Amino acid sequence: TKNEIRKNLILKRNQLSKETVQKNSNYIMEKLHPYVREAENIMIFMNMGNEVEITRLITLYPDKKFYIPKTLSDRNMKINLYDENELILHKFGYYESSSDIFYDEKILDLIIVPAVAFDYTKNRIGFGGGYYDTFLSRILLNDQNNGKNRNKPMIIGVCYDFQLIDYIPSEVH
C-alpha cells in the first residue's frame, strides 16, 4: 500500500548520512542546472530532514525568483515569494512564509516537486496530505482550459535513486 511504501522509504531516507545527502544533492543540482538556467520564476519546496537540499538553488541562482508553497485548509496550497526574513517553522517541521501575499501560479516557469517516492509513470507519494496533488491538478487543468495561449510550467520531481520505484498504486484526488 501507499502507506507501507511511505513508511519504508522515509525510514530509509532518515538513515542517510549528511555526507550522502550532500553528495546526492550536489548531483541533483547539476542535473537541474539546464532547467533552472532557462527559468525565471521557480517554485521550490523547503526541504526538511534528509530531503534533497533543494533550497541550495536560492544561493546558486541569486538572479532567479523563487516561490515556496504555503499550505492552507482543504488541501489548498498557494505560493509566496521566498524571503528569508519571512520564514516561520510549520508544525510539521518545514519552513513556510509568514506572508499573506500570494502569487498566481500561472507565472511559474518551473515547479520542483518533492516526494517520498515516484514511479516511472509520474505517480508520486508525498506525505499524505494531498496538497501537491491538488495544486498540480489545478495547474494542469488551467493549462487545458487556456488552450495553447501560454507555456506550461515544467514540472520536475526530485528524489534519491531508491525513491524511484516500479509502481505506485494510484488514487484519484
Indicate residue ranges for each PLM-predicted region.
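Surface-exposed, charge/polar-rich loops and edge strands
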Residues: 11, 63, 98-101, 106-111, ...
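Long, contiguous hydrophobic alpha-helical segments, chiefly transmembrane helices and signal peptides
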Residues: 94, 115-116
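Short polar/charged helix/loop
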Residues: 128
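Short glycine-rich, flexible loops that bind phosphorylated cofactors or substrates
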Residues: 51, 119-120
